[in-house]
Amino acid sequence: MPSTSRAGSLKDQDIAELFFRDDPEKLFSDLREIGHGSFGAVYFAHDASTREVVAIKKMSYSGKQSNEKWQDIVKEVKFLQRIKHPNSIEYKGCYLREHTAWLVMEYCLGSASDLLEVHKKPLQEIEIAAITHGALQGLAYLHSHNLIHRDIKAGNILLTEPGQVKLADFGSASIASPANSFVGTPYWMAPEVILAMDEGQYDGKVDVWSLGITCIELAERKPPLFNMNAMSALYHIAQNESPTLQSNEWSDFFRNFVDSCLQKIPQDRPTSDELLKNMFVLLERPETVLIDLIQRTKDAVRELDNLQYRKMKKLLFQEAHNGPAVETHEEEEEQEHGVGRTGTVNSIGSNQSIPSMSISASSQSSSVTSLPDASDDKSELDMMEGDHTVMSNSSVIHLKPEEENYPEEPEPRTRPSEPHSPPQVSRHKSHYRNREHFATIRTASLVTRQIQEHEQDSELREQMSGYKRMRRQHQKQLMALENKLKAEMDEHRLRLDKDLETQRNNFSAEMEKLVKKHQAAMEKELKSIANDEKKFQQHIQAQQKKELNNFLESQKREYKLRKEQLKEELNENQSTPKKEKQEWLSKQKENFQHFQAEEEANLLRRQRQYLDLECRRFKRRMLLNRHNSEQDLVREELNKRQTQKDLEHAMLLRQHESMQELEFRHLNTIQKMRCELIKLQHQTELTNQLEYNKRRERELRRKHVMEVRQQPKSLKSKELQIKKQFQDTCKIQTRQYKALRNHLLDTTPKNEHKAVLKRLKEEQTRKLAILAEQYDHSINEMLSTQALRLDEAQEAECQVLKMQLQQELELLNAYQSKIKMQAEAQHEREIHELEQRVSLHRGLLEQKIEEEMLALQNERTERIRSLLERQAREIEAFDSESMRLGFSNMILSNLSPEAFSHSYPGASGWSHNPTGGPGPHWGHPMAGPPQAWGHPMQGGPQPWGHPSGSVQGVSRGSTMGVRNSPQALRRTASGGQTEQGMSRSTSVTSQISNGSRMSYT
């Protein structure tokens, strides 16, 4: 439930379902207050419909801290609704009326602490074992459901009529385990609860510690340190050794059980399930041990109440017949008897008030109205007897089955009319009838004393309540700060993750954009290569066509010139017949035409070879250029990815530094807050201790003042006592004198009687004078002795109190010093753990970066290797195809960039890598420059002239043909391919084996 909701608000459906909407005043009748504490009051009542007896715990949630009270009520109701076990109090429902919650539960006879108060002695070991066994079963059930009681003690362990043990008072319980709140009753608190805010969380083993203290309480009537101030007890528990059983009469099983429950370190302490297997609770014992104990306690309660009743009746009768003087005497006697019966509890003084803050209804003080003034002795006696019945029954009780149908008015309405001679038997029967309406194990004096203690010790109880409230508030502040810092840390981490994700998305988009750009560039380049190849072919074909036309024109001119020369030669030779001349001329023409035809055919063949060779060269060069472009694009992509990964790693390192700085700042903030809260807590503890010291000194001074004021009355009483003794002595002496006189008168003659009487008179006077002197001396000695004794006693009490308060103050200082040292050690440990955690995170981050860099390097190497292998396969396939077509790799690579640029103006853009070799780090080796286009080829035909020249031209052409033959090309290509393959293999292998990051810039 949120703390901001209004107290008593039922708008939340989950909260509204916890409470019944009926009017509790109509459902329950005969409400009688039987106890109250800081939470409110406890009543027993009857269910109007079933006449069942129930206990109603009224808790107000108005006034100061109403929200906190309301949350405590809601928490307790939720807790009670969740539990259902034979060893836990039965929950019947909760109602709301006028800002008060009515928590309805079953009745029980009383608590284990009531047994100690009634019998005034410890319980037997088998009785302690039976009570402990039942409590352990209830605790095991709670702990199995991750619930913690946090206030186990004898006052919260209730007993029913059949001897069933039940756990009660879940106002301090925790629904979650582990917990870290400062709750419970000081003397029963486990060390880890006291140090909850300083050292961390605790679990159900705190109930095991409290159970061990409860065992000591049942064995020694009081828990350890009960004679100490509650705050001092807290400091003592937190830093000193665990308590043990003092007496040697207990068995080893019991001692070992208590020692195991009171292990200082929670990890060494057994769980409730493990304790159920302990021999102490498993030892055989009578099944009726608790029933017998309850019956003995009920009988003792009845006798004690009857004794009180008879004393009060006697006082009233004596007051009526003997007057005030006798009343005073009887009061003194009764006080002496009362001190003898209840002095053990009263000697605790104000130190006993703390446990009553959170105890259950069975062990809480009851509120009984004071007796009204009576007009006569009879009415006063009737009122006392009637009210006494209520007081003696003011406890958490269980109705006997055979007594369910009792009258509506259980109190007696008639009394004997004559108080001087009452029928004693009938009066006792009336008293027993009132008592037997409800069974109880609590005496009226216990209820009255708890009322007085609750009223007297409100200041100390409020101090402890304020201290608990402060500790809870500090815990809430620390938790609020931790939640705030955790939210800030989560927000910061989310922002960093978002920034990293944004950067990765941007990098992914940039990389995708780059890949698309590269794809478009490659597609564009492929189209450009296809167009350039087409233009290149057209250019060569145009040049060859022009060359062919020029060649044909040249042949025509040469043919005409040759024809004219032949005609001139024939004209010069007149001796040759004309027919023979015509035949020789025709033959020469035919030979020349045949030669020209061969020359034309050779030219066409060479042009065709040249075209095929140059196209093949162009394709190979374009393939190498495309490979270089692919390498450049892959290089750019890998460099881009490397840059992005470096930027991502730099951001991760920056984010790590930012998170580290924030974590250290948060830890410093928490530790600073913790130090401030510890300082404030220590100041409050010191202030409380000083106030407690002043209050104890003030109470002692008040006591001494009362003793001094009452000293004259005491001295008067002593003087009267001495005077009475003197009077008795005088009477004795007078009787002795008379007896002696009579004896002497009988034994002496009458003539001597006068002298004897005179002598006896003088002797009597002398002895009375001596007795008077002794009386004065006794009075003076008594006065001086009493005054001196009072001063010495008061001085001794002052010294004892000062020593006790000084010890408690030193204990507080030691406790606070220990807390400071533990806090400093905890802070150093937290800083060291944070440094280790940050260092480990940094190491993991660096390892992750290194792994990513290695993965990126492997990916880079694999990309390069696969690219080079693919390009090598493409070159090898191209060269194999070239060899099949009859082209040598060396010839294909023998084209100069000058000839290439001169013959094809548009080809200058492709000559940026003249050698066609690799880039700065990797690529394809390429042969020498290609031959120029459009120039006469080496070994080509000479211009037409003499036939010898023709023969030479043919021979040189044949040599050219041999050199460019498929066999030569194949041999050259195979050699070049082998060298190229070796170079490529060596380059890739060296790059992969080195494993180093290759630079592309």
UniProtKB/Swiss-Prot annotation:
ATP binds at I34, G35, H36, G37, S38, F39, G40, A41, V42, K57. It is an enzyme of class 2 (transferase). Residues 28-281 form the Protein kinase domain. Its EC number is 2.7.11.1. InterPro entries: Kinase-like_dom_sf, Prot_kinase_dom, Protein_kinase_ATP_BS, Ser/Thr_kinase_AS, TAO_STE20_kinase. Residues 350-370, 921-930 have a biased composition (Low complexity). The active site is at D151 (proton acceptor). It is found in: Cytoplasm. It catalyses: L-seryl-[protein] + ATP = O-phospho-L-seryl-[protein] + ADP + H(+); L-threonyl-[protein] + ATP = O-phospho-L-threonyl-[protein] + ADP + H(+). One of its GO terms (cellular component) is cytoplasm. Residues 458-651, 754-877 form a coiled coil. Residues 375-388, 577-586 have a biased composition (Basic and acidic residues). Its main location: cytoplasm. PROSITE patterns: PROTEIN_KINASE_ATP, PROTEIN_KINASE_DOM, PROTEIN_KINASE_ST. GO terms for biological process: cell division; DNA damage response; DNA repair; execution phase of apoptosis; mitotic G2 DNA damage checkpoint signaling; positive regulation of JNK cascade; positive regulation of stress-activated MAPK cascade; regulation of cytoskeleton organization. Gene3D superfamilies: Phosphorylase Kinase, domain 1, Transferase(Phosphotransferase) domain 1. Residues 324-431, 567-586, 911-1001 are annotated as: Disordered. GO terms for molecular function: ATP binding; protein serine kinase activity; protein serine/threonine kinase activity. Keywords: ATP-binding, Cell cycle, Cell division, Coiled coil, Cytoplasm, DNA damage, DNA repair, Kinase, Nucleotide-binding, Serine/threonine-protein kinase, Transferase. SUPFAM superfamilies: Protein kinase-like (PK-like) (SSF56112). Residues 949-967, 974-1001 have a biased composition (Polar residues). Serine/threonine-protein kinase involved in various processes such as p38/mapk14 stress-activated MAPK cascade, DNA damage response and regulation of cytoskeleton stability. Acts as an activator of the p38/MAPK14 stress-activated MAPK cascade by mediating phosphorylation and subsequent activation of upstream MAP kinase kinases. In response to DNA damage, involved in the G2/M transition DNA damage checkpoint by activating the p38/MAPK14 stress-activated MAPK cascade. Belongs to the protein kinase superfamily. STE Ser/Thr protein kinase family. STE20 subfamily. This is Serine/threonine-protein kinase TAO1-A. The gene is taok1-a.
